[in-house]
Amino acid sequence: MPFRAALRKVPVELYPLGAAVATAVGFATYSMGKKLLADPNVHIDPTVRRTI
């Protein structure tokens, strides 16, 4: 089934919910990516591996 045909079957009332979920997923991805790239405590150095 093409995407447009499937999109027509979605009730209009669910569009704001879809937009809110997409925005939340976008913010969560941005936040997680920023944390993983910026925080030096999160990086794992392959030469130094401690058992916790």
Curated annotation (Swiss-Prot):
Top-level taxon of origin: Eukaryota
Protein location: Mitochondrion inner membrane
GO cellular component: mitochondrial inner membrane
GO BP: cytochrome complex assembly
Keywords from the named record: Electron transport, Membrane, Mitochondrion, Mitochondrion inner membrane, Respiratory chain, Transmembrane, Transmembrane helix, Transport
Pfam family, one: B12D
Residues spanning the signal sequence: none
Main location group: mitochondrion
Transmembrane segments: 14-30
Function: Accessory subunit of the mitochondrial membrane respiratory chain NADH dehydrogenase (Complex I), that is believed to be not involved in catalysis. Complex I functions in the transfer of electrons from NADH to the respiratory chain. The immediate electron acceptor for the enzyme is believed to be ubiquinone.
Entry's family note: Belongs to the complex I NDUFA4 subunit family.
This protein's name: NADH dehydrogenase [ubiquinone] 1 alpha subcomplex subunit 4 homolog
The organism of origin for this protein: Schizosaccharomyces pombe (strain 972 / ATCC 24843) (Fission yeast)
Classification lineage: Eukaryota, Fungi, Dikarya, Ascomycota, Taphrinomycotina
